[in-house]
């Protein structure tokens, strides 16, 4: 009686169990996508909370509109090329993290049994939300330039009709890849031709420390829904994210959000707006984040190449939070390495967790975001003791 | 392409539009269930926010467990008769308002096309969540003692098998009625016999200023899921609620919550825990709330009986936030009175908004929670100018 289809579809809680295990202080976790605690701007958040409750207690504590706090919606619109549009905020829905945005838009745009295309491997949280919604998944291959849009085009040519194509175009989770400019143009053209929606889940785009960002998908086609979040640039515990979408899509999502949770916390929306919109704050904070993550990424990649270079290949990230390492032993199974790794005091996420159709047994996602350099060294030493030498 | 079945089912946004209209300052709104702004404990919340960010910034700002902040879960368990259970918090899921709890448990326990029984009239937010989930609704009559459990028993005897029976057993929204002790016993016995779950949505139980509360349903059968909220006893803008449920149900809801929004804001959970668990705070604040709402209820009922006693009957509430007034003109349609009422500067919610199968045209829900005495007088004067004399 207890488990409905929705619960069954949402699947196991293996990742949640893993993240709980890695909360043990003796384990160095490369598993989660948690910001480095030292980067959390606690003082700015405390000032914003105090100011919101002092200046606008009713706005922070009373029921608010389902669409979100209007100044935050305006700020988000401005960051997404809508600054000149007097009704730009009509494109914006504030959500309880971008996870909720994905869940709402899936339910708003895809009926159960409908089709969603996405890269294989794909973000675990997206897989959970999509599977819980009862949609079918079309797994598209991906490489260092992101989703293989040619392969998607072939599937479309055979008559497959996804309602959505989901991408993390900037610093993909788990693969770290960025969708190339050429593929963005091609993907946008396919969206216009076949009438599907592109969901560009973009929590990491601001965390680029090297190279130029390709043109955003939203500038290439109106059939783009961009998801953003305060989790990686401010603090995940606030649970504030957003969707920027065509107004008709935003309205459909709003209807579902009203029955899902009425609205996102008015207080945390005010905190996010007061910090992110404070002149100079975000630019300065992004410099801190990029510098921190670049240093940690270079440290992790360097240590992995030094101590495990004979056993894995490790790409050099230009941004984001993840390295998608590949074991050179083609018979390896990273899922079977996890228990010994945790026993040795280090955690990662095995490739299988991100599998849509394939298991990615030679892959492991390693996050350099959370741990400092000394902890990263310790983690690599422990990994080296667990991954068999060639 | 934009509107899925889920959006269609979730229905129109008439109530949201109404609540937006009533934000205009020249309108006295008896429409929403918003706490009187004067009762919001802004200082206590500001102190709690500052303390959380000072004492436990990581706990307030980093990702947290999907189940919720453990000290808050323990506190909720203690308020629900589980203080002596060393694992009492395992029964508790913290949610983004009790609205989310209802949505999650519906998806966890009822597949699309399954049956949910509830009183007609019923809470609008419940109707939206249930309809969005695609479940069928069995409308059960209700009277001044709440859901007519005999009528439910008759339906069960004919072979109908609801997966859930939804009640607001204390100070129902919209009817204001409290489910009698006898009916609680009978409902619990039916749950045990037929194996359905009782959802006892209880945001108003603490707002009782007269009489004794009947025994809680959770003490009568283990097949009870109790929903609670900080919205009415603290502040709705925090969006913190909870479900207290058998562990297997709590686990199924947790799986769906993970894909819905990962977890509820860690900061607002800490604020709610630090205020509600502070010795003496809640007891004192509930005295303030009960005194305020009792005075406002008596003021509204008195004014309605004085100025509209020839046109409506008005029950005297013992708690909660709502009066479910009945127009004496049996041909009246409260939905048609709304536009002239808003034009005259007063808003209410017409009975039709709460209809499951019936339209309740002679009914109107009037909230005395938000407005002070002078505004309530103004509202009644304006209503008297709109409701036709006999």
What are the language-model segments listed below?
Chain A
Residues 206, 219-252, 264-267:
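Active-site PLP attachment segment
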Residues 343, 358-390:
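PLP-dependent enzyme catalytic core of the Aspartate aminotransferase-like
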Residues 291-301, 313-326:
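Conserved glycine-rich beta-strand-loop-beta hairpin in the small C-terminal domain of fold type I
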Residues 27, 203, 342-365:
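Conserved PLP cofactor-binding pocket of PLP-dependent enzymes
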Residues 8-97, 104, 278, 347, ...:
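N-terminal small-domain helix-loop-helix segment of the aminotransferase-like
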Residues 59-194, 205-223, 293, 322:
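Conserved core of the PLP fold type I
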Residues 253-258, 278-302, 330:
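Structural signature of PLP-dependent enzymes
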Residues 331-337, 374-378:
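Short, conserved charged micro-motifs
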């Amino acid at each position: 009686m207890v488990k409905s289809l929705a619960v069954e579809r949402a699947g196991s809680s293996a990742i949640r169990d893993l993240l709980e295990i890695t909360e043990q202080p003796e384990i160095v976790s490369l598993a989660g996508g948690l910001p480095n605690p030292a980067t959390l701007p606690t003082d700015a958040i405390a000032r914003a909370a105090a100011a919101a409750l002092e200046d606008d207690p009713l706005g922070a504590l009373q029921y608010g509109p389902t669409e979100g706090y209007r100044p935050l919606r305006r700020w988000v619109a401005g960051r997404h090329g809508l600054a000149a549009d007097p009704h730009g905020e009509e494109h914006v829905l504030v959500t309880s993290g971008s996870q909720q945005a994905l869940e709402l838009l899936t339910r708003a745009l895809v009926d159960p049994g409908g089709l969603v295309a996405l890269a294989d491997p794909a973000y675990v949280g997206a897989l959970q939300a999509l599977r819980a919604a009862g949609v079918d998944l079309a797994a598209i291959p991906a490489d260092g330039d992101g989703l293989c849009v040619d392969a998607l085009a072939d599937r479309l040519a055979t008559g497959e009709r996804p309602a959505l194509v989901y991408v993390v175009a900037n610093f993909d989770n788990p693969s770290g890849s960025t969708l190339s400019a050429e593929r963005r143009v091609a993907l946008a053209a396919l969206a216009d031709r076949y009438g599907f929606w592109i969901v560009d889940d973009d929590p990491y785009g601001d965390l680029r420390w090297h190279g130029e960002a390709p043109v955003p998908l939203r500038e290439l086609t109106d059939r783009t829904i961009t998801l953003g979040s305060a989790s990686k640039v401010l603090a995940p515990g606030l649970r504030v994210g957003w969707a920027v979408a065509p107004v008709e899509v935003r309205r459909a999502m709003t209807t579902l959000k009203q029955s899902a949770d009425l609205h996102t916390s008015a207080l945390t929306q005010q905190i996010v707006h007061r910090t992110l919109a404070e002149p100079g704050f975000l630019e300065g904070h992004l410099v801190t984040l990029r510098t921190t993550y670049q240093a940690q990424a270079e440290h992790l990649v360097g240590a992995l190449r030094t101590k495990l270079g004979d056993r894995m290949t490790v790409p050099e990230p230009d941004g984001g939070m993840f390295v998608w390492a590949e074991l050179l032993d083609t018979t390896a199974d990273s899922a079977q390495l996890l228990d010994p790794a945790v026993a040795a005091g280090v955690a990662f996420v095995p490739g299988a967790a991100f599998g849509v159709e394939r298991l990615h047994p030679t892959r492991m996602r390693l996050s350099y975001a959370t741990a400092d350099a000394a902890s990263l060294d310790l983690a690599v030493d422990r990994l080296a003791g667990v991954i068999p030498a060639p």
